[in-house]
Amino acid sequence: MTLKKRSSAPELPTSLDEDEEEDSPQPLSNTPFFSMKNLIVATPIILTPLLYGYNLGFVGPYSTMYGYASNCQLYSAKKSCETLTAAKCRWFNASTYVSNTTYGEVCGWADRTTCFLKYSDEAGCLSDSACKWSYSANTCGNQVGYSSIQSGVFAGSLVIGSTMGALMGGYLTKRLDYCKSFLFIGLLSVIGNVLTHVATGLFHYWVLFVARIVLGFPLGWQSITSSHYTDKFAPANHAKTLGTLFQVSVSTGIFVTSFFGLVLGNTIQYDAASNANTMGRMQGLVSVSTLLSIFVVFLPLITKDGYSKSRRGDYEGENSEDASRKAAEEYTMTQMIGPILNGVAMGCVTQLTGINANMNFAPTIMSNLGLQPLVGNIIVMAWNMLATFCVIPLSRRFSMRTLFLFCGFVGSLCCVFLGGIPVYPGVTKSDKAISGIAITGIAIFIALYEMGVGPCFYVLAVDVFPESFRPIGSSITVGVMFIFNLIINICYPIATEGISGGPSGNPNKGQAVAFIFFGCIGVVACVIEYFFLQPWVEPEAKMTDDLDGAAVPEGKHD
């Protein structure tokens, strides 16, 4: 094959990275970014992550509301006290319980110690397993809501299902194609939410645990299917930006949960002569997720199948010969060890830097820093959502790799030097200074995470693999990320409480150690990824063979 004839052979794209695509001879779509065509293509990556985000942000508000529903001490009217269903409460005169008291009629526990009446000193309070001492208020109170172990298992239950869904998502999507996949994702989500309604009505913890696992499976599955669908059918010049909508939708869903949590949880009338209806409020929080699941069931009406087609073939007029050649470029698991290890490192940066500790336990963290739990929660989630929208213009200016590494590295430093070291007891003298520095550190970390790490992860989870290996590769990458997520969700509340010295210890100690750990992991992972993280590029020899095959044989010119 002569040089002249080689130059006439069709040139193949070598990378899916933005910087490489600029020189690609593939025709780009003239479709404007804000168009009905792009909206239809992006609907799955908007709706299904919105459902995922809502349930990701569900743990904090739901747990806080359960704490309100099981805390008899909060209620100051007989009707609201005795109609509480999450705890056995009774209305009585305090003088019949203890002789030396300034309280009159109070709401206390019918089946265990009413700690705020019985104990006024720390030693007596800590001697009773039903009680805990508050160092901030210098009072004794009952253990209410979920324990640290229950909180961790509750937060982890969704992730258990999501991990299984993510690991199986590539295989299931390949077998079912897109329309049936979205249908089953919607139906399984509805089933999971119905079980959550049942668990809430019964106040049964283990039914809730099972319900969240069932719900987690389709939410993990959708993280593969929706990203792959958008990457497949989006125009080349909009694909990366549309891909970042996954994290934008997740953060929006988290904010929606915090909004409903604030509206439902902070409007309880503790002194009203009526039923506080805490169970109904918790059911209302679940019902939004149920409604979103029903919407997902109808996604097949606007989506289309085409799993076996090459990427963006419908938009860019790719011929069937090119498509079949790409589909035939199979890679073994051994050949993909490098990209898979890249995916593991990305999972470390995405989860082991502590984002879901902030998301799931934001009410507790903000309460420890002096804010009302649900108010602090919505502030965190609003900031989280606003920061995510910044990725849309940034993704059109910088590559996914640059955003991921820069934001991950700087965010990890914030964890150590703002969220960790200054919060450790004895380092900063003023409580107000501790709160101010820690909240600033958390805010900067969340902003950097949502402007780079989170949105770029789901794009890079596809881009680091060749096209034929993407369903399996992205499933492994997202599955590993969910495993790290599970570890954090279960271990964070247990570890921070243990490091702090138990339920009555100083929570700042455990929180500081956790954030220092998060930051160190993030810094190390980002340094490793700086040298190894690259979008997939076909090996030069393979590209040359493809070009030779596409050229006209010399004999046919003679």
UniProtKB/Swiss-Prot annotation:
It is a multi-pass membrane protein. Residues 60-152, 201-204, 263-281, 357-373, 424-441, 500-512 are extracellular. Residues 1-28 are annotated as: Disordered. It is found in: Membrane. Keywords: Membrane, Sugar transport, Transmembrane, Transmembrane helix, Transport. It holds the Pfam family Sugar_tr. PANTHER family: FACILITATED GLUCOSE TRANSPORTER PROTEIN 1, SOLUTE CARRIER FAMILY 2. Belongs to the major facilitator superfamily. Sugar transporter (TC 2.A.1.1) family. This is Membrane transporter D2. The lineage of its organism: Eukaryota, Discoba, Euglenozoa, Kinetoplastea, Metakinetoplastina.
